[in-house]
Amino acid sequence: MQNLRPRQKGFTLIELAIATAVLLFGVVAVMQLVPYAMKTNTANRYDTTSVVIAQRLLDELTAQPFNNLTVTDPICGVMSLGAGAAGIPTMSPTANYLTMFNGNATVDFTQAAVAGYNCNYTDPNSASGGVYQVRWGVVVTDSAAGKVVSKRFVVGVQRSAMQFRFPVNVETTVQR
């Protein structure tokens, strides 16, 4: 009678070591993505808050009558709505306060802030008490008779102390 040895079943130690190394490599690669995902999630949350602040302020600015020169806001205080000159579009507060970026009007945060056209907004929902700098510019177009025909509002919001993030800009035009 012939004594046959039963066939071996299962993994060898080398196969197990290779599988463990591949799995470990995959876990380490994925773990390196976690800090980046957390950073972009936080930045996106700040951008979303900036859009909400800008839209709230833009809604308030556009709801004002055309001839109003100021409006009082509970957060920003007295806000200027721009003043026009007969027959020509006038940019308020200054001609270089708004700049063109990729074909869109934006608030230039490299310029010094102008009183009446900026405020700081503290986020009440942020545990760290995030502060956002809010600025706006107004382009007023008057008729030859000196009557306001249209106002273009551009609102920019930027989180203070955030490096390498562009400010959020929203704009609208109100016409008679």
Predicted regions and their residues:
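C-terminal juxtamembrane segment of a hydrophobic transmembrane alpha-helix
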Residues: V22-N44
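Low-complexity, Gly/Pro-rich coil/beta segments used as flexible assembly/activation regions
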Residues: T48-R176
